[in-house]
Amino acid sequence: MPAPTFDELAQLPPPTLRQLIRRGDYAGHTSGLGQRHLQANLVILQKSWADEFLRFCALNPRACPLLDVSEPGSPHFARLGADIDVRSDLPRYRVHRRGQEPVEVNDIGAFWEADFVAFAIGCSFSFEQALRDAGIGLRHLELGRNVAMYRSSIATRPSGRLAGPTVVSMRPMKAADAIRAIQVTSRFPLTHGAPLHLGDPTLIGIRDLARPDYGDPVPLAADEIPLFWACGVTPQAVLAEAQPELYISHAPGHMLVSDRLYDEL
């Protein structure tokens, strides 16, 4: 049987999509998948870091809107779906060890530890369908790419050992669409809400839009302006500075697709 096309994947209900991912039949980005369902960034930390990270999320709700937290040792997010297993249900993960480059894998069962605490953080992929419903085109989806993400000069509010830059995702739009996008996304605070910035990227420390720190470059037309949303990759930038001995995250753009609708929580 041939592998499903991306358009076919986009029509699948989340449990079916997760089954494909769990079997290793899909390992690509999730922008455009799940239709109107919440997507989540993932952070998995040893319990000794969990309280600090929980407070970090509370202090930085635009970048880290918390959707669910697992019990220590549990790989499940009961609030987001009955059969979710965070060890296998994301297309791609990053395993981070102190002093080493992250390793990307498609399953983290072999790395799981009894004191791990998993955090699900809202993702802007969740409101992309609402933008499309409003007639707003999304260039990265039109090109079949991941969204472009950048480390900005906007500082997060620190929590203990955790401090660092806010990562932002960028979507180019014409001015009229930008106004409508602000109106639409402001309704969804659990998926980063309205943009943090629009216009000149140098004002938030971004020198070259053609060279994103994460994801894929997305071209900007002459009559468009860039809009920047807070991004759930922010914890990866912050944890890279804090240097826990071990933590696991999603690979940027490769999210957990939940059973919850984006306007349900």
Swiss-Prot record:
Keyword match Lyase: yes
SUPFAM superfamilies (UniProt xref): PSTPO5379-like
Keyword Acetylation: no
InterPro entries membership: D-Glu_cyclase (IPR009906), Putative_hydro-lyase (IPR038021), UPF0317 (IPR016938)
Gene Ontology terms for molecular function: lyase activity
Record key words, sorted: Lyase
Alphabetical list of Gene3D superfamilies matching this protein: PSTPO5379-like, PSTPO5379-like domain
Recorded superkingdom: Bacteria
Pfam entry (one): D-Glu_cyclase
Enzyme class: lyase
Protein family (similarity comment): Belongs to the D-glutamate cyclase family.
PANTHER family: D-GLUTAMATE CYCLASE, MITOCHONDRIAL
Protein name: Putative hydro-lyase PSPA7_3193
Organism from which the protein derives: Pseudomonas paraeruginosa (strain DSM 24068 / PA7)
Taxonomy of the source species: Bacteria, Pseudomonadati, Pseudomonadota, Gammaproteobacteria, Pseudomonadales
